[in-house]
Amino acid sequence: MAIRCGEVQKLATIPGKGFIEGPSYCPDDGFLYFVEIEAGWISRVSMDGKYEQFYNIGAPGGLMGPNGMIYDSKEKRLLIAHRDMGVVSLDPKTKKAEVIVGDYKGKKFNGPNDLIIDSKGNIFFSDPWGTSISNPVGSVYRWDAKTGQTDAFMEHMAFPNGVLISPDEQFIYVCEFGQNRVMRAFLADGGKSHVFMHAMTYFSGGMGPDSMGMDMEGNLYVGHFGYGKVFVVEPRLGEVIEVIDVPDKEATGTDNARFGGPDNKTLFITEGFQRNIYKVPVSIPGLPIPYIPAG
């Protein structure tokens, strides 16, 4: 199916300072949740643009706060990659927060950044802070829902950021921000390991791919930080097949693109510098998180 994107519209400009990230639509209450990184807030906006702060999860030092976030439609919870706390679960109804994983072999993470969950409840999350092209020590970890064990899943990366899994759970995709590319690997052993990791898509200019969403056909919607664009990448050859521009020239910090809305056919884009949230109708619905095929 050809991708058709409608007009990009601004849903809201969020008051305050600091970056916003992690747009996550909750179908139970119709709000789009997002994080205010430096302030430590999990906030939300209604579909008519009304904003409210929802839950303060904390941000020690003003930077060690929440970053990536997804809505787990199976368990009806928000999952948050928190730079200081690790991976945290938050119930939107009760506001009960619980740390799922806070360390690896007794040592705190460098700072989790983004995450995804598979159909079995296993969580994959990136840990990029303190890494660079010259010091590629970033990792993607896998938390096992059955055993509670955490393993280093992908290593030696230059600021790994957004993480996604293909609809058939055969591939994992990671935005390697420091190298300005999207990496892809085959999942093996039922998702417990990976093989044949390679660069799928390179970008030129800008700072790097940040976070991304996926539609039902497996296309990636990559928010590129520094460009003010979302690149739609087809998964077979890694080619850019569409470019979505945000309408404000100064809004170049496009840090995430995720699906939501009543029919899951609205793409929500967060922009960090101007604290804008955009929405755009799309022809192919987004992939539910987690995606559990019928039957």
Task: List PLM regions with ranges.
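Beta-rich, blade/repeat-based domains predominating
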Residues: 14-29, 58-84, 105-123, 131, ...
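Short loop/turn segments immediately following the C-termini of beta-strands
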Residues: 37, 82-83, 128-129, 177, ...
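A short loop-to-beta-strand structural motif that recurs across blades of beta-propeller domains
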Residues: 41-43, 86-88, 138-141, 181-183, ...
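Predominantly a core beta-strand signature of beta-propeller blades
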Residues: 7-10, 50-54, 95-98, 148-151, ...
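A short helix->beta-strand "capping" segment at the edge of beta-propeller domains
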Residues: 1-18, 47-49, 55, 197-198, ...
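Short loop/turn segments that connect beta-strands within beta-propeller blades
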Residues: 46-50, 91-95, 144-148, 186-190, ...
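Beta-propeller domains
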Residues: 31-57
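Blade-level signature of beta-propeller repeat domains, shared across WD40, Kelch, NHL, RCC1
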Residues: 256-295
